[in-house]
């Protein structure tokens, strides 16, 4: 996809690891119509999931996210945090008309996985951290670790100073097709 121009190298992270980005509006539109609309929106889970997120109904968001993974993914494709990160980031692009969608941004003491910065400051911001659990029983612990990491590393620093009054800190843990979400409002 990089060689064909659908993705662009943004920066090198480590040996053989790179941050990629969608290079322009046309390809973002293609991605939205060709992937999001075709595979996710048609599943009847995607729109309600995004609506639940934006309304702050994180329990419903978690339920719908779980449904998306059960219906639209193959267990064999879900290996490692990068896969979940990419899938989730692809879903967040759907919100780009109202939010600045950021990935792997550096903040204070580390790098958050994803962030939604509202274009309208009366809307909430969302900071996401992802973890992969080795076991289904470990999902809750990993989601709590992800949430703690957001706080400890101050990934949401500066959002309040920008005039954003509500920030959702959301830790998400994955194991195969299983999902667990922990959150708090700052």
Task: Briefly describe each language-model feature range.
Residues 158, 162-186:
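Domain-level recognition of nuclease-like catalytic cores that cleave nucleotide substrates
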Residues 2-154, 179-186:
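Extended alpha-helical interface modules used as scaffolds for assembling large macromolecular complexes
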């Amino acid at each position: 996809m990089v060689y064909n121009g659908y993705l662009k190298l943004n920066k090198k992270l480590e040996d053989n690891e790179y941050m990629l980005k969608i290079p322009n509006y046309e390809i973002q539109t293609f991605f939205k119509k060709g992937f999001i609309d075709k595979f996710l929106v048609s599943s009847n889970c995607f729109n309600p999931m995004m609506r639940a997120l934006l309304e702050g109904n994180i329990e419903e968001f978690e339920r719908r996210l779980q449904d998306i993974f059960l219906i639209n993914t193959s267990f064999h494709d879900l290996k490692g945090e990068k896969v979940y990160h990419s899938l989730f980031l692809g879903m967040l692009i759907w919100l780009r008309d109202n939010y600045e969608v950021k990935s792997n941004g550096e903040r204070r003491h580390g790098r958050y996985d994803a962030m939604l910065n509202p274009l309208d400051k009366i809307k909430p911001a969302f900071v996401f951290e992802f973890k992969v659990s080795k076991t289904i029983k470990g999902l809750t612990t990993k989601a709590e670790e992800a949430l703690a990491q957001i706080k400890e590393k101050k990934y949401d620093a500066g959002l309040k100073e920008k005039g954003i009054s509500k920030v959702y800190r959301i830790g998400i843990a994955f194991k195969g097709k299983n999902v667990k979400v922990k959150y708090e409002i700052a």
